[in-house]
């Protein structure tokens, strides 16, 4: 081994190869045979003879030294590692010799010459499996024989062996704490080779190959000291070391300190004691001690003393760099590493700025200054120009400009400007501003802002300093300039335009470039121009949306014109006749529906249970922007004729019970005044047409999709010129309602009056259904009785109305059913009749105001709700020519204030 401290490292490939080879039986056999050959003495002799012949050819005499056991010396290498020195003997080593001599004092004695040989150190382990180092020093047998009879000679041999190890391998051995264990040899003996040059050797032709192979052997790690060449290295030093009674152990002193947050701040007293440690840590290495009881430790405020007599002699004195608190210290011995750790806190005296005193020399400084002669500075007779330093880098600041009449305001965006460094120089048409600021690296930056105004004279210049900028105000004699020049000096100017035309951008083809993706359209409906309270609306739309809106408006106007022409050509008498026939069919079908309700009572209860279990996907206000709300509480007539029409129907309004009704599109059709101008409901109507009747009433769950002719004749729908029957309309509405069934379903918005009358704040709507189940059953039975008993009453009322009407008017009669809904829609959905009629029937016995809207057609529509599908509707001829009716449909949404 070249180095004792080197660890034997085995790579993965080598470990894998060795494992595979040892797993092979043939390899194990061959390896066992090889080991047997090495142990065979005959083979060893043959190997030694061949090696001697080879070395003799090169002029060297080779001897194989086999160390025989003698005695062992135990010590410490460099104060850290245990070491064992084997003092061995061999007959091939030279015998000791002595001569009589006299020392410097004149005393006579013997001068001994002791030959020895030593091998390379090797690594081994002690009885505790701790690393140690083993050295072999081989003497002649006569040398060891003399040590047994003479103690002084034994000490001489021991010192010689230690000197040989220290001189050859440059280590330091502890000679004070030497031990001699009861061992004759440490470890396994290894053969050593001694090479000596032959004296009468004839020089032969050098073989380059042999010289190359044995070049390393010339620097053999095995050394042999002849008696003539034997000299002890640093002999005086070793003698002085042997005279010491104690060994100074190796130690290290550590300064330990914890960093506090307040020391990282920029305060003046933050780093007053930053260099003083918090505690001192003294680590002492004691490899020959087993516990702390074998040594004595004394600690003072400035020193540490350690002494040990048994089993090893150690003595240590350490002066501490800081004053410590000896009473607060602690010590700990580590048996594994055989180290003693002493922890001593440092006594710190916290100083403040007030503790700083002024020395006597500083106090005498003012007196000394007064005694010095004062040098007077003579003023210059002629002013001299001071040129700026050419090494200074001039920076042009970033700025922004504003103009108002003949006043210019320049904002120079520079921070931390020194106000004392601002210099302004005003010329006829030029302004120069110089200033400095402190940059991020705490170094000054120099700025120059130079201005020139062509065809203008500067009358006044002012400046204001702020934390983030400088405002430079320049006043000119006139404001008729279109540009100015700015830069660092007069030779480096850039032209800046005062006003740039941003909107007029012409491309290379000569066309104007505009971003028409978003425009502001100011529109005022032409239909509403004659209204008294016209409103101006501003909408922000894209270009595509404007084109689509124009197409919808043109289509809507065409439909309105077509319906108006159809109304003029249609005969009112024929329309009323068709309506009476339809109402007769409706009355017959209603009688059948009463019987069907009893048969499907079980199915209704199951359907109601399914409704309770339904969940809504969005909040109740997610589609408020899609609803149309019409308030008809107190209609204000715009002309006198309209007022008279409302007065004529006042009696019938009071007789009708106050009930809520979910009206259809036909019920809320726009009303026209005498001039033919539509009311505000035209906008709501166009919104409903665009959504294709997607939404139902807010108070009912009716799935009936009624056609145009269910509530009134075709001539009343002058705005809907179509011949589509109710079935096709129902299919289209079902398709559109299915698209929004999950997102916009059951969205309800009530006013304060309905909230206070119909709902309780501490319960939910589904909870109220369960509580009102019995009420719904009783109301359904009462409804059946009224249908059977109300035929004669309805006939008497209709006869009374016929006698009171003016001659020549057409009256629509309904003898069996008071609803204008076609029987087809009811028959198609017999099960969909809503059983939740508590909202409509809650005010059954109260009087309700009729909803009346005047139009050109001389008819009056009076509607009152008994339930969602049974609506009493009567068309009466009004006394006034300007009266009109309104059509109701189930998918309209209203807020009716009571």
From Swiss-Prot:
Chain residue ranges for the region called Disordered: 558-680, 765-822
Extent of Basic residues compositional bias: 603-616
Cellular component GO terms held in the UniProt record: cytoplasm
The keyword Ligase appears for this protein: no
Any single biological process term in GO: axonemal dynein complex assembly
A Pfam cross-reference name: PIH1
InterPro entries in alphabetical order: Kintoun, PIH1/Kintoun_subfamily, PIH1_N, PIH1D1/2/3_CS-like
Main localization of the protein described in the UniProt heading: cytoplasm
Biased composition (Polar residues): 641-656
Basic and acidic residues composition-biased segments: 575-602
S-S bonds: none
TM ranges: none
Keyword Cytoplasm: yes
Highest taxon above the source species: Eukaryota
Keywords: Cytoplasm
Subcellular location as annotated: Cytoplasm
Family: Belongs to the PIH1 family. Kintoun subfamily.
Role according to the record: Required for cytoplasmic pre-assembly of axonemal dyneins, thereby playing a central role in motility in cilia and flagella. Involved in pre-assembly of dynein arm complexes in the cytoplasm before intraflagellar transport loads them for the ciliary compartment.
Protein name: Protein kintoun
Taxonomic source organism: Aedes aegypti
Lineage, highest ranks first: Eukaryota, Metazoa, Ecdysozoa, Arthropoda, Hexapoda
């Amino acid at each position: 081994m070249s180095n004792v401290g080197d660890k034997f490292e085995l790579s993965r490939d080598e470990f894998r190869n060795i494992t595979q080879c040892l797993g092979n039986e043939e390899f194990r056999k061959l390896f066992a045979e090889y080991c047997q050959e090495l142990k065979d003495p005959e083979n060893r002799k043959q190997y030694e003879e061949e090696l001697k012949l080879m070395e003799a050819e090169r002029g060297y005499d080779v001897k194989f030294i086999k160390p025989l056991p003698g005695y062992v010396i135990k010590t410490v290498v460099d104060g850290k590692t245990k070491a064992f020195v084997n003092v061995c003997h061999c007959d091939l080593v030279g015998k000791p010799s002595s001569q009589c001599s006299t020392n410097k004092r004149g005393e006579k004695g013997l001068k001994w010459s002791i030959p020895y040989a030593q091998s390379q150190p090797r690594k081994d382990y002690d009885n505790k499996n701790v690393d140690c180092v083993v050295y072999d020093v081989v003497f002649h047998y006569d040398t060891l024989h003399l040590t047994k009879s003479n103690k002084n000679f034994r000490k001489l041999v021991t010192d010689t062996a230690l000197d040989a190890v220290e001189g050859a391998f440059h280590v330091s051995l502890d000679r004070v704490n030497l031990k001699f264990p009861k061992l004759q040899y440490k470890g396994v003996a290894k053969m050593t080779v001694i090479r000596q040059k032959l004296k009468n050797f004839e020089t032969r032709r050098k073989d380059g190959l042999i010289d190359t192979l044995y070049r390393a052997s010339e620097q053999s790690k095995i050394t042999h000291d002849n008696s003539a060449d034997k000299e002890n290295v640093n002999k005086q030093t070793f003698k002085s070391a042997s005279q010491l009674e104690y060994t100074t152990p190796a130690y290290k002193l550590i300064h330990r300190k914890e960093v506090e947050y307040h020391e990282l701040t920029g305060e003046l007293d933050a780093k007053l004691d930053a260099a003083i440690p918090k505690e001192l840590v003294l680590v002492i290495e004691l490899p020959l001690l087993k516990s702390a009881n074998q040594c004595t430790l004394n600690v003072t405020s400035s020193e540490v003393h350690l002494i040990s007599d048994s089993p090893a002699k150690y003595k240590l004195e350490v002066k501490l760099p800081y004053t410590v608190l000896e009473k607060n210290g602690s010590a700990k011995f580590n048996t594994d590493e055989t180290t003693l750790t002493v922890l001593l806190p440092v006594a710190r005296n916290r100083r403040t700025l007030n503790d700083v005193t002024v020395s006597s020399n500083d106090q005498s400084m003012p007196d000394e200054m007064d005694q010095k002669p004062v040098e007077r500075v003579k003023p210059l007779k002629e002013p001299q120009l001071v040129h700026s330093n050419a090494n200074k880098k001039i920076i042009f600041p970033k700025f922004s400009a504003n103009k108002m009449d003949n006043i210019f305001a320049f904002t120079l965006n520079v921070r931390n400007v020194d106000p004392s460094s601002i210099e302004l120089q005003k010329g006829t048409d030029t302004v120069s501003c110089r200033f400095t600021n402190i940059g991020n690296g705490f170094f000054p930056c120099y700025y120059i802002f130079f201005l020139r105004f062509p065809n203008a004279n500067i009358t006044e210049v002012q400046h204001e300093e702020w934390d983030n900028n400088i405002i430079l105000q320049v006043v000119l004699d006139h404001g008729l300039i279109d540009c100015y020049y700015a830069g660092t000096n007069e030779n480096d100017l850039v032209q800046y335009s005062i006003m740039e035309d941003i909107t007029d951008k012409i491309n290379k083809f000569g066309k104007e470039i505009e971003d028409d993706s978003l425009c502001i359209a100011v529109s005022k409906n032409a239909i509403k121009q004659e209204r008294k309270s016209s409103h101006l609306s501003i909408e922000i739309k894209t270009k595509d949306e404007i084109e689509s809106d124009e197409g919808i408006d043109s289509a809507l106007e065409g439909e309105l014109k077509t319906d108006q022409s159809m109304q003029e050509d249609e005969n009112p008498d024929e329309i009323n006749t068709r309506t009476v026939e339809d109402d007769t069919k409706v009355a017959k079908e209603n009688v059948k529906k009463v019987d069907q309700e009893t048969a499907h009572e079980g199915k209704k209860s199951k359907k109601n249970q399914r409704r309770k279990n339904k969940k809504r996907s969005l909040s109740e206000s997610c589609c408020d922007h899609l609803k149309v709300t019409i308030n008809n509480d107190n209609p204000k007539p715009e002309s006198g004729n309209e007022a008279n029409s409302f007065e004529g129907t006042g009696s019938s309004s009071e007789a009708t019970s106050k009930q809520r009704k979910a009206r259809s599109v036909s019920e809320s059709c726009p009303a026209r005044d005498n001039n033919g101008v539509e009311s505000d409901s035209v906008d709501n109507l166009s919104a409903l047409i665009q959504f294709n009747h997607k939404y139902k009433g807010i108070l009912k769950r009716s799935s009936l999709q009624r056609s145009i002719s269910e509530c009134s004749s075709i001539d009343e729908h002058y705005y809907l010129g179509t011949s589509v029957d109710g079935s096709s309309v129902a299919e289209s509405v079902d398709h559109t309602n299915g698209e929004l069934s999950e997102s916009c379903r059951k969205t309800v918005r009530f006013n304060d009056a309905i909230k206070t009358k119909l709902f309780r704040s501490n319960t939910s709507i589904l909870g109220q259904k369960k509580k009102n189940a019995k009420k719904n059953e009783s109301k359904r039975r009462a409804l059946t009785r009224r249908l059977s008993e109300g035929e004669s009453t309805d006939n008497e009322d209709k006869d009374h109305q016929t006698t009171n009407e003016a001659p020549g008017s057409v009256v629509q009669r309904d003898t069996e059913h008071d609803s204008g809904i076609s029987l087809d829609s009811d028959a198609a959905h017999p099960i969909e009749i809503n059983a939740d009629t508590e909202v409509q029937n809650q005010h059954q016995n109260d009087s309700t105001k009729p909803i009346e809207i005047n139009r050109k057609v001389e008819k009056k529509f009076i509607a009152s709700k008994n339930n969602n599908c049974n609506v009493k509707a009567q068309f009466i001829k009004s006394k006034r020519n300007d009266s009109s009716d309104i059509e109701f449909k189930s998918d309209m949404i209203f807020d009716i204030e009571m």
